[in-house]
Every structure is written in C-alpha cells, then in structure tokens.
Amino acid sequence: MSNNIPAELKYVASHEWLRLEEDGTITVGITHHAQELLGDIVFVELPEVGANLAAEEQAGVVESVKAASDVYAPIAGEVVAVNEDLPSAPETANSDPYGAGWFFKLKPANVADYDSLLTAEQYAGEVD
C-alpha cells in the first residue's frame, strides 16, 4: 500500500480519512489525494465542538488557491474536539494530512459504522 494511503486508517469516497483512537473517538482529516487535488490550502473552517453531525453532513470547508471544497462527517457523531492549530496554519493539511493536519474528532453515534468504511485498499481503488 502506498505511503499516501496508510493501511491502518479507514476512508470514505469523499476523501476523508478516519482513525479509531484508544478512547473510542474517531479522528477525521482529508486524504493526501484530496490535498493534492486542492493544491495549496489557504483557509480551513472547522465544525463547532458539541455539534451533532449526521453521516455525510457538511462538517467544514477547506479553501485552496484552486478551489473550495466541503469537508464531510464520514459517520454520525458528536464533535468532541477540533484542531485549534489548523485555521492559523491551514497548509498543515497539505504537509501532514494524516498527522498534524487532522480536522476534528468525533464521538461516534455507533462505533460499528467505522467498520463499514473503506479500507486503504478499497480507497486506493477509488482514486486510481
């Protein structure tokens, strides 16, 4: 599997990645492929902590020199944290999309939803 699609994460076709954390929360960000398509990211709008999001509901916005794109909640849940550093350093979503460039954390409404998402191999098939 490519370094650009880490095998330990889950994915959705709208180019968000998810990581199940030890505390049961799910960290969400945009994929390497998404940041490549967008180009240099210049603005990020994140959801409010405490917001209850439905699966596939718009959770934020990312703007680049090329385009603006919505960021979606891959599964239903409550936003329990946002990456406070991202709005002042949106380029982090380009340079470290799977690390410091994460967007928000969800407390999933149903953690089993995580298991039904795309594997790295399946997501790679979506973007090839």
Swiss-Prot record:
<dbReference type="InterPro" id="IPR003016">
    <property type="entry name" value="2-oxoA_DH_lipoyl-BS"/>
</dbReference>
<feature type="domain" description="Lipoyl-binding">
    <location>
        <begin position="25"/>
        <end position="107"/>
    </location>
</feature>
<comment type="subunit">
    <text>The glycine cleavage system is composed of four proteins: P, T, L and H.</text>
</comment>
<dbReference type="InterPro" id="IPR002930">
    <property type="entry name" value="GCV_H"/>
</dbReference>
<dbReference type="InterPro" id="IPR017453">
    <property type="entry name" value="GCV_H_sub"/>
</dbReference>
<dbReference type="InterPro" id="IPR000089">
    <property type="entry name" value="Biotin_lipoyl"/>
</dbReference>
<comment type="similarity">
    <text>Belongs to the GcvH family.</text>
</comment>
<dbReference type="GO" id="GO:0005960">
    <property type="term" value="C:glycine cleavage complex"/>
</dbReference>
<feature type="modified residue" description="N6-lipoyllysine">
    <location>
        <position position="66"/>
    </location>
</feature>
<dbReference type="InterPro" id="IPR011053">
    <property type="entry name" value="Single_hybrid_motif"/>
</dbReference>
<comment type="function">
    <text>The glycine cleavage system catalyzes the degradation of glycine. The H protein shuttles the methylamine group of glycine from the P protein to the T protein.</text>
</comment>
<dbReference type="GO" id="GO:0019464">
    <property type="term" value="P:glycine decarboxylation via glycine cleavage system"/>
</dbReference>
<dbReference type="Pfam" id="PF01597">
    <property type="entry name" value="GCV_H"/>
</dbReference>
<keyword id="KW-0450">Lipoyl</keyword>
<protein>
    <recommendedName>
        <fullName>Glycine cleavage system H protein</fullName>
    </recommendedName>
</protein>
<dbReference type="GO" id="GO:0005829">
    <property type="term" value="C:cytosol"/>
</dbReference>
<dbReference type="InterPro" id="IPR033753">
    <property type="entry name" value="GCV_H/Fam206"/>
</dbReference>
